[in-house]
Every structure is written in C-alpha cells, then in structure tokens.
Amino acid sequence: MSALAMLLSSTTAAAHATPAACEKRLLPPSPGAAAGQNLAAKDLVQLRDFGESSVSPDGRWAALILRRADPARDDYCIGLVLVPLQGSGAARFLDIGGEPIQLRMDLRGVSDIVNGSIADDAPVWSPDGRTIAYLRRDRGVTQVWIATPQGRPRQLTRLADDARSVEWSTSTTLRIQYRPTSKALAQISREGRGGYLYDRRFWALSEARPNPPPSPFEIVTVEISGGRTVPNLAAAPDPKRSPAARLYVTIPEGGRAWTAPQQPLRYAGPSVLTVEYRGRRIACGDICGSRVSAIWAQGDTVLFLRSGNPANGGETEIYRWDLAREPSPRRILATQDALYSCALAGSKLVCGRETALHPRTLAAIDSGTGATNTLYDPNADLAGRIRNSVERLRWTDPNGISSYGDLVLPAGYRPGQRLPLVIVQYQSQGFLRGGVGDEYPIHLFAARGYAVLSITRPRPPSSDSDAPDADSYQRINITGWADRRRVQASLEAGINALVARGVADPDRIGLTGLSDGSSTVQFALINSSRIRAAAMSTCCESSASGVSVGLAYSDSLTRWGYPAPGSDNPQFWKPYSLAANAEQMQTPLLIQVSDREYRLALETYAALDAANAPVEMYVFPDEHHVKFHPEHRLAVYERNLAWFDFWLKDQPTADPGSAATMARWQALRLRSTR
C-alpha cells in the first residue's frame, strides 16, 4: 500500500431533528414506494445504513444502530432498532437520537486521529437477554446507554471522557472502556500560552497543535441499576486458549477451534484454522489455510467463513463441518455478496448482507443448506430503481498477479457499444455505492451512460514476503515503486479486457480514487497515456509529503526508503510525483480534499498550476480523511458527475448556477491542449 494510504485521515451541525421527525425518516418505506423514479445523488446520500448487529442470547431478536443522513440539515438521524428473527413481527425502535461516532486511531505516536468514517459498533445484549447496552454520542461526548427490549432507554454513564466500548461482565454489570484524555488536553492548552514546542506530538497535516501521546485505555465496571461503580472483575481467561489465537471457539461436545499465524515471525503472514475434537487434532487441508475470518460452534459442528480476496475473485464462502460424521468440511455457500457481522442464532447465521445492486439488509443463512432469506431491509424503496447490470470480471496481469472488478453497465446496453469508462477504486465488494470513501457514485455514472469498472487492487508485493515488521513490509513495496507498478499493471489488464470486449472507448477513460486509490491515480497519470480525465479525493505524495504531515510520519517514510527531508533525489520522485512532472501533465485533474488534509496537496497543486496544467481543487471544511458531512458528500457526488460529463462526454451542465464553473472548465480545456 502507498504511504498516502497509511495516513488516516467533531462535527458541528445545525440543531438536530426531533425524535419524531427522525423516526419518520428512519422508518423503512413500503417496498416499491419510489418505483419508477430515477435514482438521484440525494437518494444515495440518504440511504439508511447500519453497521454490526448482535443477536439476543435466546436467538429471537437482533439489535442494530440505524442511521440516515440528511443533506438539507447537514445532519444524521440515528436509532436503536430491534429486529424479530422469528415470526412475522415488524422491526421497531427502542431509542432515537444522538450523533454519529467517528472512528479514531493512534498513528505514529499520535493519539486519537479522527478518520471521518462512522463507527459500526453493535449494541450488546446482557447474558440474560433483558437489557441492551450501546454507545450514544450527544453534544460531542460519547456515553453508555441501556434499553430493554420493551424500550425505556436511559443514559447510564456521565464520564468525563468518551466511552470507547462496552461489554457485559454479568447480567447486571457492565465493563466500560475509556481513555482519560481530558487532563492531557487541558495541559496542552496551557502549554499554548507560551507556544507549543514543535515535536513528534504534532500531526501537522490536520491541526496546528500537538496531540497527547497514546495513553492506556482504562476500565470501569458499573451497575446498571443505579450507575454505581464497583470493583473491576476481569473475566478469567480460558486456559485452553493460546495467546496467539486470533479467533477462538469452544466446541460444546468437546473440543475447540482457533486461528493463529502459521509463521508467527512474519509481520503479515496468513493465519490457519486448527480444530481439536475429543482429544485429537483434525486436519482439514487447504480449506483451513488462510482467509478464515469467523468461526462458530454448535454441538459437534463447526462453521467457518472464508473471506474473498483478489486472487479468488472476491468470493466469500461458508463451510460446515459435522465433526462426528464428516471427514472434512463441506461448503454450504459461495457468494459474491458481502457478509458482515454474522452471528449464530439456532440453526441460522444472521448476517448483514450486501449485493452489488442493493445496500445492506439483515439476512438469515441456513447453516445446513446455505439458503438465504431477508429479515430486515431498511431501504426497501430502492427495489427496482437501480436498473444497471453488474458482472464480476477476473483478470491476471502479465506477471501472473490476479485481481478482479465489477463491470456496471446502463440498462439497455447493446453489446459492442463503446461507452466512456470511469474506474472506481480500490475494493469492490458489497453494494457498489461510491468506492472506498464513497465519493464516486457508481450506479449514477452507469445510469448516465458510462461503463463503470469498480476494481479491487491486487495484494502488495510484500504480502508474500517474510518481512518481520511494518517498516520492512513497507520498504519492499516502496523499493522501485514495486507496489505502484503492480497496481498499475492490474489496472491496465482490466482496461484491456474492456477494450477488447468492445465495451470501453479507449479514448474516453476516467480514473478516480481516495487514499491508496489517489496514489494509483497519481502513478497512472505519469506512467500511462490512457487516462483522459481524473478525480482525486486525497492528494498527493511528493518531496514535501513527510514534513507536511509531521515529524513522526516523516521518520516512518525515511525508514520505508523515502529520501530524508532536505535531500534532493529527483530520480526517486520522477516515476511518482505529479509535482516533479508538472510540465508534462495535460490530463484534467479534479481534487476534492478535506481541510484536515489539503496541506498535503499544496506542492502538487502549485506546481501544476504554475505549469498551466488543467487542475481544479476544492477544500471542504470540518472534514477528515473520509468526508462525513451529508451536504459535502452530496456536493462531491454532483461535482464528480459533472466533471466527467464535461471531459468524457463533452456535456457541460445546463444548471444556471454552474455557469461560472463551466467557464473555468472551458479555460482548463485550453490548458489541456497546450
């Protein structure tokens, strides 16, 4: 992966909608309620989304957090939903309110860098099934709330610092994880009175003040009856569980199953599944080697899920193994659909499920046959509104490296008709919304007459190495730009396949990307002549990248093989830096970046502009690596559609409000032919 992808990237919104208004927005509409209406950018932004779900101990219910964006208010509606898993009852809300919780990560010695993506944590059921605990954020602080299956939500904690996770220790007590940062942040504010010492605490890309170094998370145990804090009682570890086990289950009829690294000294080596049953270890061959990402056990039976990858065309598989009766596992399901957060409920697996043409639903998968049926669809009104066709394509580059993509074509496409092609990156799985970061609306492009290729990047060269640590792993990818060359070769192979089929017009190809996808755009614009227009959501690696982000990040780049700050190495940058190749750049480039990351783009934009290259850049306020604000996401969608219409279809938008934009783009057209 590129250094740009190693970056990660409090939101201020208008007054929230009332719970009653939000309930109306969140309620699933009747199937076909919008039948016959064309899909619009606003419809995609306003889809009802949920992350992980959890199943009650008795297997009768699932709980999940549902959210829906509102671009008109630049806000979100959020609700705790209870879904019946048996019978025909309707899903119902137990709580409505709160704000989205954004993901945070520690990176390069800097704590709690906000990514912009919304956390997908599931509500958690008490062991007796009487209470559900969940995280809810209000007025910028995340606390623990509880509700019963009958409703009656209430706030349990009033922590000074955000609650980060919650789990049950008994049916009446909760273990809550938090990070005490308020004192450290106050100390940094006091430091500012005399000026901040610039050091490795700075993530200068995002803000002009230091962050506290990562501090340990702490645990508090709370009684749910009155919120009283009680002594922490950590669960006793299972003495049979190896410390190296990544996944682990106990087999009720006597045994255990777990995954662990096959070669523990490798930084990113594969994990393999091991099964012990009634005192003996049972081999299951290649099926249990790598890609096992979930395990369940019931009676004498083990179920496990193998995730898709670039080499197998992204196919997800579920296997069932009756240890008392079957010599080896048997596959009960193979699918191109994406499955999320599966949990065993009786004889069924309950999973979040996405298809290429429909967003996430809650589905039940029969653990004996693999038969699947939908339990809950929060976007039933989308049925019939996406009329594009989707085909999974697989290809191999000249070096034998495999990957895949999804070809999306407009309804009524005639074989042999060459269409302008837009390529979206860099993981093609589940509902084809907008690529990684969700900025390039795949189905809207197809509905406007484009062929769209949603691609999955190949595994990096370092994935087959014995690299012992992250720095060694990255150094393999950076040396000779090995990873970028591999991704470019795969990209070219996918394009060649569509040109050979008569689908893609080779003179009208557009390329898009965020994060690692932006790195692919950057490399392709220098090393290929096939791209006629491009759009980036993050930009760009250049000789100034390290110092733009901060000292700790710059240290990492140097360890990976980048030139040290202050050193002049044009030979290193020539194959990759747009700034170093600005004089040759003629491909129109649209850059839409966040205010927390735009500094990384300044050298590249300035060099391209000075060279009279066709470039335009927008900076979105209060955003991070992934854009979060609904009104910004809508603006990004619409501008990307207009950009490629202008350059690949020669169709300026007729919107009177866009006259100034069209005049600028016409001026850029003169630059592109200089």
Q: What residues fall within each predicted segment?
A:
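Blade-terminus and WD-like Trp-Asp/Gly-His loop motifs, strongest in beta-propeller folds
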Residues: 53-62, 121-131, 139, 165-174, ...
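Structural motif
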Residues: 73-80, 140-145, 184-189, 215-220, ...
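Multi-bladed beta-propeller domains
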Residues: 16-49, 83-119, 136, 146-164, ...
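Active-site-proximal cap/loop segments of hydrolase catalytic domains
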Residues: 455-674
